[in-house]
């Protein structure tokens, strides 16, 4: 081959490669990976899709904070190894969180291309999904307790990790917990699978149990102790447990039979709860879009203990 032919061939190849590059969307980021430590566990994250406004390091910090919140509440992480798939979507915010037991623990979640660091710092969804891994897999009729625990524990875990405020948590609980109260035609938590009863009805169960455990143990134990015991007994999402086994495990850990009895009251019938009276006893009043506290209220110490940091051991 002559020198002239070689040069022409080289330029043709270069032009063809440049043409192929032009066909790739400019915003496509391809795939990248990072690993986060969560106590003695490992989270392996994969990012796919279009380029994001936030950096990989900011995404890594977001994952780390969610993991830290779970460790703060449970004293450990839920599974030895979590696979986390982060996808992009055209927009802003975090959405589409789903948690599965496959691969030893798998979470899929989406981050918008226009999402900011502040959006990630205020996100609750990834923590919510991670909490799902801390409780045994339930039969379909008990899905309310899976969502209820994730809904109730998530803000408390973030408070204990220094990521959220107790005043904001109580404001949101006063605002949203009534969504979990039974409505006309309700047949109990095991038989009423509406959005309100599944998420907020489950959270209502957790809240009532937390307060009652603390009342019966002179505020020495709470729902957090029960949930830690369930996880420490091997009750994470990788395993199927009967709901009775999980609740009995929690009751034994706190030394009082609250969880199982409350379940018996709420599973088949629409048990009402006087939330207004409870807020008053806990010393919580909402004014001008914020929670105000009365530290002289009868159950004020219980209110404080619910979100207070707890040693890991």
Residue ranges and their predicted role:
Residues 17, 236-313:
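Beta/coil-rich, acidic/histidine-enriched accessory regions frequently appended to metallopeptidases
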Residues 2-15:
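Bacterial N-terminal signal peptides that target proteins for export
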Residues 53-65, 116-121, 125, 140, ...:
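Soluble non-cytosolic domains of exported or imported proteins
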Residues 29-30:
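Boundary at the C-terminal end of the N-terminal hydrophobic targeting segment
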Residues 141-210, 215-217, 223, 232-237:
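Acidic/His/Gly-enriched intrinsically disordered linker/tail segments
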Residues 73-86, 137-143, 161-169, 220-226, ...:
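Surface-exposed patches in mature extracellular/periplasmic domains of secreted proteins
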Residues 13-23:
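Bacterial N-terminal signal peptides
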Residues 34-138, 142:
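Juxtacatalytic substrate-recognition/specificity segment
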């Amino acid at each position: 081959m002559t020198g002239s032919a070689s040069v022409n061939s080289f330029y043709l190849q270069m032009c063809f490669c440049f043409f192929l590059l032009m066909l790739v969307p400019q915003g496509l980021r391809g795939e990248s990976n990072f690993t986060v430590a969560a106590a003695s566990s490992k989270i392996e994250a994969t990012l796919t899709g279009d380029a994001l406004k936030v950096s990989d390091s900011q995404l890594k910090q977001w994952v780390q904070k969610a993991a830290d919140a779970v460790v703060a509440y449970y004293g450990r992480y839920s599974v030895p190894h979590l696979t986390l798939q982060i996808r992009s979507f055209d927009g802003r915010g975090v959405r589409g969180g789903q948690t599965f037991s496959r691969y030893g623990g798998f979470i899929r979640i989406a981050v918008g291309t226009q999402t900011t660091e502040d959006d990630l710092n205020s996100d609750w969804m990834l923590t919510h999904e991670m909490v799902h891994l801390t409780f045994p897999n339930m039969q379909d009729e008990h899905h309310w307790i899976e969502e209820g625990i994730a809904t109730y524990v998530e803000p408390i875990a973030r408070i204990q990790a220094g990521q959220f405020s107790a005043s904001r948590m109580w404001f949101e609980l006063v605002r949203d917990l009534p969504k979990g109260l039974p409505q006309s035609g309700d047949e109990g938590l095991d038989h009423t699978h509406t959005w309100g009863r599944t998420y907020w009805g489950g959270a209502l169960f957790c809240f009532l149990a937390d307060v009652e455990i603390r009342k019966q143990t002179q505020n020495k134990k709470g729902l957090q102790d029960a949930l830690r015991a369930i996880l420490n007994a091997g009750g994470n999402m990788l395993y199927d447990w009967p709901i009775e086994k999980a609740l009995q495990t929690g009751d034994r850990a706190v030394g009082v039979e609250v969880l199982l009895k409350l379940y018996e009251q709420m599973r088949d019938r629409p048990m009402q709860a006087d939330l207004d009276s409870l807020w008053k006893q806990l010393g919580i009043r909402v004014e001008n879009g914020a929670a105000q506290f009365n530290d002289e209220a009868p159950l004020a110490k219980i209110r404080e203990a619910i979100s207070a940091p707890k040693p890991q051991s």
